[in-house]
Amino acid sequence: MKGFFQVKEALRYLENARAILRTAPIEDNTYTDGKPVQEACGTAYLAVLKAIDQYLLKKGIEEKELPQSVDGYREMLPKYLMIHNGSLLKEFDKLYKLLHIAGYYRGLLEDVTVVKDSLKAARIFIEKVK
């Protein structure tokens, strides 16, 4: 039952990201206000991190030992999650680049389809991590 709530928390973050996106105006399949898109991408990336953190806690990692950087996550994924799915590190890197770097940090994502597909990819990743 505990694992359900852990995944539920990550999915709650993802739903928050979708709610933020719904506030962004769209014209010709393009978001015309970058601020809510950046916020949504940042929140979706946090959902991915939350899912990984909760999985690691479930596997016995102490909270103080959780990764503190993207490189830390890249080190933890092969040790604890790659056993179950070898493509998770590649998927994590894609989500990091799309959601965190391009979407949140740089504010480069404006295409509605690309943003929505990125959030779908985040959900698929979260489901794999549980």
List the predicted regions and their residue ranges.
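Terminal alpha-helical segments
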Residues: M1-K130
